[in-house]
Amino acid sequence: MNTVRVTFLLVFVLAVSLGQADKDENRMEMQGKTEQGKSYLDFAENLLLQKLEELEAKLLEEDSEESRNSRQKRCIGEGVPCDENDPRCCSGLVCLKPTLHGIWYKSYYCYKK
């Protein structure tokens, strides 16, 4: 019976000591994996940031092209309706109420002086 107790005690001590070693190895392995995972996350984050910056640059470029092409005229030509409070008629033109043939429009138009 003493032999069984000694054997059991020996197996128990070996299991505990090897279990501790495995626990330490597992802890170190997990730390290595988390550090490796952080480096992968940093890499993925940098890659995503680069893609977003490229996309933003393209969008800003399109906006600048769009604003260049869709620029409003700075003055209104002859015979075009205008606002009496904010006349934008070109030089040599005046924003006046139409006479005779344009009375029914009830609007102001750019006419030559």
From Swiss-Prot:
Protein location: Secreted
GO CC annotations, alphabetized: extracellular region
Residue positions assigned to the propeptide: 22-74
Record key words, sorted: Disulfide bond, Ion channel impairing toxin, Knottin, Secreted, Signal, Toxin
Disulfide bonds: C75-C90, C82-C95, C89-C110
Tissues/organs with expression: Expressed by the venom gland.
InterPro entries: Toxin_22
An MF annotation (GO) of this entry: toxin activity
Family: Belongs to the neurotoxin 14 (magi-1) family. 01 (HNTX-16) subfamily.
Function as written in the Swiss-Prot or TrEMBL entry: Probable ion channel inhibitor.
Protein name, per record: U11-theraphotoxin-Hhn1a
Organism for this UniProt entry: Cyriopagopus hainanus (Chinese bird spider)
